[in-house]
């Protein structure tokens, strides 16, 4: 018999939450974007094609790969304290990211960090007006591609100089892997955002709980409703679309112990919509529980130094897995240009030399699945259908019965892993797209 636990990297606390409210009809849907139309996308694709063939600086390498990511975000946020609104805002914006590679697939500027100039990385971002015309979109695409190209040239020069000085351990490993064009242009409809007025009413009602509780110094209740649409277009012919929808609540309370130590406790839950969140009665109970917990911590005696075993359970067990296991499941090589110690700040997983070795108890197996939306009745918000390089996400069995089967990787290959499994996330400057855990499922056999 197996027990299965799901760890969501984006919001790990969600995975151990009590069962969410019963599923109901999704309500009104968001519909297709009005800001990013097919005409806007066509204009950007034309500019990519033009830049690929015509963008040149005399004596410099031309671009061999250009990728653009359009991101449209709609978000409603509200924060309340002691029954009064302290923040309430609706936001709507569109950004255009350009990624330029110069050289070729064998040796380009990517996965290299220039010391003390980490943001010179062949990437550039500009905001696109909400009511942009195709002409405006094409001009913004030209400007952002030009900026990324100039950075890519600086990056490749520094990378070549570093390699000439012997600053790489694997000069034969390709910089970037080829991918067949992927086309998925159908609109992905998700439930529309909740009304910010409705979220504000809930936040004010729940935040009133902390009125009159003397030991609580500060308290906040925040709700968010978030919609993200993404489009990927590149010079290889990929044209893909994905949409993500998240709603969440967080309750925070602080106090001060008698010895002056600042104390804080919080409660958070996330889902695809507000219908996945606990109801008001449950949130009111959780707020009261936070106040009681804070008082107990405030009055607790100071613990002496302790050396010995520690048992983590519930949310603590999730955080241990999230912080000690999940970051090491990426197979993307550390970026060149820095010492191993410095490069660690940009992330770093297990070496692919460990594939095939035992890394966990034989009772445990680990699978990462960005395409999962639910685990039982619990909403999972850490996934995606398309990764940050426009590659379709894949379910990957990472560990089976304690043995490492593979690692999570994007288009930057390692010594043994040469094909992306759709897990690339842009997690650091330096043009570094790393294979990253998303919805991590851990299954255990009875021992």
Model-derived features: positions:
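A short, polar/charged loop-to-alpha-helix boundary motif
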Residues: 413-426
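Short amphipathic alpha-helical "recognition" segments used for binding
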Residues: 6-7, 51
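Active-site bordering "gate/hinge" segments
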Residues: 18-386, 391-395, 400-403, 416, ...
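Bacterial N-terminal signal peptides
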Residues: 7-17
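Extended C-terminal subregions enriched in glycine
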Residues: 352-357, 426-447
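Positively charged n-region of N-terminal signal peptides that target proteins for export
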Residues: 1-4
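Short, catalytically relevant binding-site loops at active-site mouths
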Residues: 373, 412-415, 446-447
């Amino acid at each position: 018999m197996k027990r299965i636990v799901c760890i969501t990297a984006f919001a790990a606390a969600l995975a151990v939450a009590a069962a969410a409210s019963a599923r109901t009809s999704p309500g009104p849907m968001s519909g297709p974007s009005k800001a990013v139309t097919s005409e806007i996308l066509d204009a950007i694709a034309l500019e990519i094609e033009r830049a690929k063939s015509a963008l040149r600086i005399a004596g410099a390498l031309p671009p061999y790969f250009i990728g653009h990511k359009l991101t449209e975000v709609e978000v409603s946020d509200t924060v309340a304290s002691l029954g009064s609104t302290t923040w309430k805002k609706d936001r709507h914006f569109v950004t255009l990211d350009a990624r330029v590679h110069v050289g070729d697939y064998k040796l380009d500027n990517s996965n290299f960090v220039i010391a003390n100039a980490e943001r010179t990385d062949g990437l550039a971002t500009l905001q696109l007006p909400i009511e942009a015309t195709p002409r405006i979109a094409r001009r913004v695409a030209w400007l952002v591609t030009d900026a990324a190209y100039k950075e890519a040239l600086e990056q490749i020069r520094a990378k070549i100089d570093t390699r000439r000085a012997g600053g790489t351990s694997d000069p034969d490993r390709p910089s970037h892997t080829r991918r067949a064009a992927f086309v998925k242009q159908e609109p992905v409809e998700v439930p529309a955002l909740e009304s910010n007025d409705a979220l504000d009413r809930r936040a004010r009602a729940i935040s009133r709980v902390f009125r009159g509780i003397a030991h609580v110094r500060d308290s906040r209740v925040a709700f968010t409703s978030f919609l993200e649409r993404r489009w990927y277009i590149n010079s290889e012919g990929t044209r893909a679309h994905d949409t993500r929808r998240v709603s969440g609540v967080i309750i925070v309370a602080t106090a001060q112990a008698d010895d002056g130590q600042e104390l804080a406790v919080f409660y958070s839950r996330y889902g695809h919509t507000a219908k996945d969140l606990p109801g008001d009665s449950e949130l009111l109970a959780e707020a009261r529980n936070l106040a009681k917990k804070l008082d107990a911590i405030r009055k607790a005696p100071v613990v002496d130094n302790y050396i010995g075993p520690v048992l983590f359970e519930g949310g603590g067990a999730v955080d241990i897995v999230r912080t000690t296991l999940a970051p090491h499941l990426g197979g993307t090589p550390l970026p060149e240009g820095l010492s191993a110690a410095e490069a660690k700040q940009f992330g770093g997983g297990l070496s692919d030399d460990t594939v095939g070795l035992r890394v966990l108890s034989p009772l445990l197996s680990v699978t990462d699945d960005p395409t999962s939306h639910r685990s039982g009745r619990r909403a999972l918000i850490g996934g995606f259908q398309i990764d940050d390089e426009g590659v379709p996400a894949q379910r990957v069995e990472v560990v089976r019965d304690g043995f490492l089967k593979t690692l999570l990787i994007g288009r930057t290959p390692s010594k043994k892993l040469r094909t992306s499994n759709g897990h690339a996330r842009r997690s650091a400057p330096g043009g570094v797209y790393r294979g990253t855990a998303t919805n991590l499922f851990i299954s255990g056999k009875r021992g």
